[in-house]
């Protein structure tokens, strides 16, 4: 049955993303400027750091999704991982903003180790957290409502870290920025642990996979054709399946390496390498998907199921583009107000304004989706936010009020995007189960988390690469004036391009609200007739 969630459970779930965003938005907004202006790493080196660390995410997100899907405890599949990873997430949050007295090479090594540690802990925590939404209820409207609470919590956490961090650094550091960052992060790490515990102990996992016959006709318009027998790969140990997954990882890592190299170097050689890799990867994927199901292991079949899931593939592209859109803006704000506007304290006030508006945008998403439909709302929100963001380019340099008005207006619509994205990921998991009789909720959400983090990493790297191309050096004030045009572009039309691209892509999304209801009803019918099995 479709379980209606209580307000307590929705708020409790939202507290988890408030905690996660103390890390996520703190790193997104301030880690780049911390590396370049406090720790003394060059913009180009920091850009490469952000890109390389995202390659490790390509492995850990997918592996974590598979591990979570195969976890069976009294607490469920996902909540034990959230609870166990929380202390490590808080610790690495502090370490990333700590400045040990090292040589330049030592600083780079330290930055790589601590940032990789942070992203690994975030993966182990946030992949299960994201997937938890998919098993708390099977009602798509309840998921949209829950997603609204999630991102209201996210923006509340972001409000704390992004709005208060500059003031806390100044207050606790007493003129020593490095000390101020470290003490501030200890405060946020403590709060993170408390909020994550609230989430774990106020939520419950309810949705389980059912043993069903695989439909012969998997077209969306034929949901009731359920004859035929599902081919279920023989159970194997998690270790065996992870080893098997390792054999499939080149399909992820090699294309990621190619696009990372091309993104950073932007020359003919890396461009040719990227095109070649994509062509070979496409051939390899086609060969894999044509194999008979009986020859596939479970991990292979999970990957095949998702690669044939058009809604999921489109959502992955949307996740990347929307994160580039939001990530570029958030990544340059600290630089923009410190140097372009000439008032660093405005950074915190601007973030507070954005995040207050974001909370209203996230909470309004459920009602707006009911009015327009989620697909149409996604398009409207992207176009409106992109147009308003691009308008910042034409605002005079000292027009603070105009910047705040345009920025907040754009942020209201931008806040709708992640709320819809994670709600619709649950729909794509339903669609996969509908077509194949198999469900891999953790893998679906881990991939969603991966593209979001990849988009954030590429967005941060793009900010640093653009600033570096203008000759920016955070320790040399003489380089600032020449980088102001780059800051202006990064705050306006550059992110808007990714928003317009996202609006075009979502037009291809095949699941409107009516079709999603068909899928939901078909699955509810199956679940009422069949006993549950482990997913």
Each predicted region: which residue ranges?
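Membrane-embedded alpha-helical bundles of multi-pass transporters/translocases
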Residues: 1-535
């Amino acid at each position: 049955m479709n379980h209606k969630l209580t307000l307590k459970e929705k708020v409790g779930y939202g507290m988890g993303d408030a905690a996660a965003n103390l890390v996520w938005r703190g790193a997104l907004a301030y880690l780049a400027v911390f590396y370049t202006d406090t720790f003394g790493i060059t913009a180009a080196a920091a850009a490469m750091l952000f890109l390389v660390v995202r390659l490790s995410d390509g492995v850990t997100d997918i592996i974590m999704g598979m591990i979570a899907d195969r976890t069976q405890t009294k607490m469920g599949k996902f909540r034990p991982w959230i609870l166990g990873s929380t202390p490590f997430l808080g610790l690495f949050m502090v370490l990333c903003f700590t400045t040990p007295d090292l040589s330049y090479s030592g600083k780079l090594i330290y930055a790589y180790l601590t940032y990789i540690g942070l992203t690994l802990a975030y993966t182990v925590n946030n992949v299960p957290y994201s997937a938890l939404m998919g098993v708390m209820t099977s009602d798509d409207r309840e998921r949209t409502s829950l997603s609204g609470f999630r991102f209201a919590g996210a923006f509340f956490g972001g409000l704390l870290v992004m709005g208060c961090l500059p003031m806390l650094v100044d207050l606790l550091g007493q003129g020593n920025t490095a000390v101020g960052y470290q003490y501030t992060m200890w405060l946020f790490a403590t709060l993170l642990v408390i909020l994550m515990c609230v989430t774990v102990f106020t939520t419950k996992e309810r949705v389980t996979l059912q043993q069903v016959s695989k439909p012969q006709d998997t077209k969306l318009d034929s949901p009731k054709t359920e004859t035929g027998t599902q081919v279920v790969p023989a159970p194997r140990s998690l270790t065996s399946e992870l080893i098997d997954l390792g054999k499939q990882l080149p399909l992820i890592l090699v294309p990621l390496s190619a696009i990372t190299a091309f993104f950073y170097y932007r020359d003919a050689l890396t461009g040719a390498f990227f095109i070649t890799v994509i062509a070979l990867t496409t051939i390899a994927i086609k060969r894999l998907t044509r194999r008979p199901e009986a020859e596939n292991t479970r991990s292979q079949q999970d990957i095949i199921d998702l690669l044939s899931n058009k809604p999921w593939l489109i959502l992955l592209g949307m996740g990347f583009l929307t994160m580039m859109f939001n990530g570029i803006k958030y990544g340059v704000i600290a630089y923009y107000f410190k140097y372009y506007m000439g008032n660093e304290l405005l950074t915190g006030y601007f973030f507070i304004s954005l995040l207050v508006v974001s909370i209203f945008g996230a909470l309004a998403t459920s009602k707006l989706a009911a009015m327009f439909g989620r697909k149409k709302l996604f398009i409207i929100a992207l176009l409106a936010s992109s147009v308003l963001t691009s308008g910042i380019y034409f605002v005079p340099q000292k027009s603070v009020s105009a910047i705040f008005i345009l920025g907040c207006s754009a942020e209201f619509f931008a806040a709708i995007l992640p709320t819809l994205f994670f709600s619709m990921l649950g729909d794509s998991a339903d669609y996969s189960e509908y077509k194949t009789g198999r469900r891999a909720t953790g893998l679906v959400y881990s991939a969603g988390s991966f593209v979001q983090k990849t988009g954030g990493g590429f967005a941060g790297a793009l900010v640093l690469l653009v600033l570096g191309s203008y000759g920016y050096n955070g320790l040399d004030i003489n380089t600032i004036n020449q980088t102001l045009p780059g800051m202006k572009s990064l705050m306006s039309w550059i992110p808007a391009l990714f928003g317009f691209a996202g609006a075009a892509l979502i037009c291809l999304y095949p699941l409107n609200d009516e079709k999603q209801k068909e899928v939901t009803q078909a699955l509810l019918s199956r679940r009422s007739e069949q006993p549950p099995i482990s997913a």
